[in-house]
Swiss-Prot record:
Changing D605V: In a breast cancer sample; somatic mutation. The modification Phosphoserine is found at S516, S523, S542. The gene is AMFR. Keywords: Disease variant, Endoplasmic reticulum, Hereditary spastic paraplegia, Lipoprotein, Membrane, Metal-binding, Neurodegeneration, Palmitate, Phosphoprotein, Receptor, Transferase, Transmembrane, Transmembrane helix, Ubl conjugation pathway, Wnt signaling pathway, Zinc, Zinc-finger. It comes from Homo sapiens. This is E3 ubiquitin-protein ligase AMFR. The CUE domain is required for recognition of misfolded proteins such as mutant CFTR.
Length: 643
């Protein structure tokens, strides 16, 4: 639990802290020297001093010859309840100076991530050890508090040094141009830390034996934890240095690294779990702040052990399936392929061949198959046995870590979940406390639940269409309604799952009913240009019809496209959105009907005005329109026959 208010507190610099600590130590030494050099000042003070100095008989014999000795001053400082904390602060200051010296010699300037890790590690350690001292041990005397503070000061020094070595090793291992001197300095520091852990074990056995078995168990667990962490980093470093000095590619490196991490992490988790169980049984297991903190840590450690074992089972299953199904590539296949591994971009002296024909390193392929069961290059689905069970277990592991599972090879996300499960078992604390569970589930499914807004879909569709202008907009939008992801829709386009029509099909699909009205005025216009004087009425009416139809096309086409973009698709999965789309469509149809009615009325009035003087008897506008269209059709047929 990071203490944010402590992190934001304006702490002094190391130079200022060292100066203040030195002044405090100097002041306490002067005060103790003055108190010890005044035996004649009061009758009561010499009695106390002689009582405290009974093991040293020569001391009272010459009190004024050379003054009090350094040992007497040290005993006086340790016996005083205020001055002893100055000594503890001085010890902490010395450890910080040693750590600063080690940093300058071994590491140099620290990176931002290393500083943040050290800060988090330090405040977490301080918080949990404060709970341990005053909540679990419930110490009553100043001597016990001082002893535990000095013990934990040495432990936090070792923990921070090991954490810094681990971060620096991870940084140096990814740099191919790191000199061997840097590796040598870090490895030498790790060996020194391991020897210091052996010294801690000796102190633990001496001090813990005199204070009881529980104290011995607590101190042994703490020293074992830091020893295992140090040994873990040393083993990883040895494997890395062996790989650097090994000629060619070391295929077995991944296996050694995995089993080293597995054994060390499981050992650490088991030790920490038993240590917290011991704290819970030793301390007050009833309702208290310390018990709640220990319960939370126990729950976290238990889930970590489960997750690590589940991951190991998945690893064994992947290795078994890979060795049984994918054969090792022959030298001829490696020579024909003559390519680097697509995962690590390193040359391949040995590789495994997938059914699709692609070659990968054994360790690279194993790491990939732990996360996904498809080819890393072509995304071909690999029919591995128990594929569904592996996917379910992998999704369960991701839900524990609040991660999103990788999409399947078909490119369609089945179910993306972010679940948060909280369980409180009150019976483990007190019989009268209730037990309850709370699960917060955020699910995005095709049949699901709240769909993404149309503005987001349109923005994603325009983004994809900028990359693939040949794909129609409505096809992109329909696929986005299913995938809800720009990446998956892009993969579907690249892999051919979206059938891209010819360019002429786009205009037909967007406005299929507008082609015939457009052809009609053009044909009438051509006929009007070649018609005789006796056919003057169609000549006068055809431009008007063309303007009318062009106006209708201009009015209908943008509205349909705009309406298509606004609604997102032809059919929505949400009932509210469908109702809103129907109401919107109804209003648009009414507006279009009014426009057509007004255009038709104006056209009929103009036709009646032009036909009444010439026709006389036939005053029906519908009849006139039919005759005009029939004459135009006859002329079109005649023109086609003559041509």
């Amino acid at each position: 639990m990071p203490l944010l208010f402590l992190e934001r507190f304006p702490w002094p610099s190391l130079r200022t802290y060292t100066g203040l600590s030195g002044l405090a130590l100097l002041g306490t030494i002067i005060s103790a020297y003055r108190a010890l050099s005044q035996p004649e000042a009061g009758p009561g003070e010499p009695d106390q001093l002689t009582a405290s100095l009974q093991p040293e008989p020569p001391a009272p014999a010459r009190p004024s010859a050379g003054g009090p000795r350094a040992r007497d001053v040290a005993q006086y400082l340790l016996s005083d309840s205020l001055f002893v904390w100055v000594l503890v602060n001085t010890a902490c200051c010395v450890l910080m100076l040693v750590a600063k010296l080690i940093q300058c010699i071994v590491f140099g300037p620290l990176r931002v991530s290393e500083r943040q890790h050290l800060k988090d590690k330090f405040w977490n350690f301080i918080f949990y050890k404060f709970i341990f001292i005053f909540g679990v041990l419930n110490v009553q005397t100043v001597e016990e508090v001082v002893m535990w503070c000095l013990w934990f000061a040495g432990l936090v020094f070792l923990h921070l040094m090991v954490q810094l070595c681990k971060d620096r090793f991870e940084y140096l291992s990814f740099s191919p141009t790191t000199p061997m001197s840097s590796h040598g300095r870090v490895l030498s520091l790790l060996v020194a830390m391991l020897l210091s852990c052996c010294g801690l074990a000796a102190v633990c056995s001496i001090t813990g034996y005199t204070h009881g078995m529980h104290t011995l168990a607590f101190m042994a667990a703490e020293s074992l934890l830091v020893t295992v962490r140090t040994a873990h980093v040393i083993l990883r470093y040895v494997i890395h240095l062996w790989d650097l000095n090994h000629e060619g590619t070391w295929e077995g490196k991944g296996t050694y690294v995995y089993y080293t991490d597995f054994v060390m992490e499981l050992t650490l988790l088991s030790l920490d779990l038993m240590h917290h169980i011991h704290m819970l049984l030793f301390g007050n297991i009833w309702l208290s702040m310390a018990s709640l903190v220990i319960f939370m840590q126990l729950r976290y450690l238990f889930h970590e052990v489960q997750r690590r074992i589940r991951r190991h089972k998945n690893y064994l299953r992947v290795v078994g399936n890979m060795e049984a199904r994918f054969a090792v590539a022959t030298p001829e296949e490696l020579a024909v392929n003559n390519d680097d591994c697509a995962i690590c971009w390193d040359s391949m002296q040995a590789a495994r061949k997938l059914p699709c024909g692609h070659l990968f390193h054994n360790s690279c392929l194993r790491s990939w198959l732990e996360q996904d069961t498809s080819c890393p290059t072509c995304r071909m689905s690999l029919n591995i046995a128990d594929n569904n069970r592996v996917r379910e277990e992998h999704q369960g592991e991701n839900l524990d870590e609040n991660l999103v599972p990788v999409a399947a090879a078909e490119g369609r996300p089945r179910l993306n979940q972010h679940n948060h499960f909280f369980h409180f078992d009150g019976s483990r604390i007190a019989s009268w406390l209730p037990s309850f569970s709370v699960e917060v589930m955020h699910t995005t499914n095709i049949l699901g639940i709240t769909q993404a807004s149309n503005s987001q879909l349109n923005a994603m569709a325009h983004q994809i269409q900028e990359m693939f202008p040949q794909v129609p907009y409505h096809l992109v939008l329909q696929d986005l309604q299913l995938t809800r992801s720009v990446e998956i829709t892009t993969d579907n386009i690249l892999e051919g799952r979206i059938q891209v029509p010819f360019p002429t099909q786009r205009s037909d699909s967007i406005r299929p009913a507008l082609n015939s009205p457009v052809e009609r005025p053009s044909s009438d216009q051509e006929e009007g240009e070649t018609s005789a004087q006796t056919e003057r009425v169609p000549l006068d009416l055809s431009p008007r019809l063309e303007e009318t139809l062009d106006f209708g096309e201009v009015e209908v086409e943008p509205s349909e496209v705009e309406d298509f973009e606004a609604r997102g698709s032809r059919f929505s999965k949400s009932a509210d959105e469908r109702q809103r789309m129907l109401v919107q469509r109804k209003d648009e149809l009414l507006q279009q009907a009014r426009k057509r009615f007004l255009n038709k009325s104006s056209e009929d009035d103009a036709a009646s005005e032009s036909f009444l003087p010439s026709e006389g008897a036939s005053s029906d506008p519908v009849t006139l329109r039919r005759r005009m269209l029939a004459a135009a059709a006859e002329r079109r047929l005649q023109k086609q026959q003559t041509s």
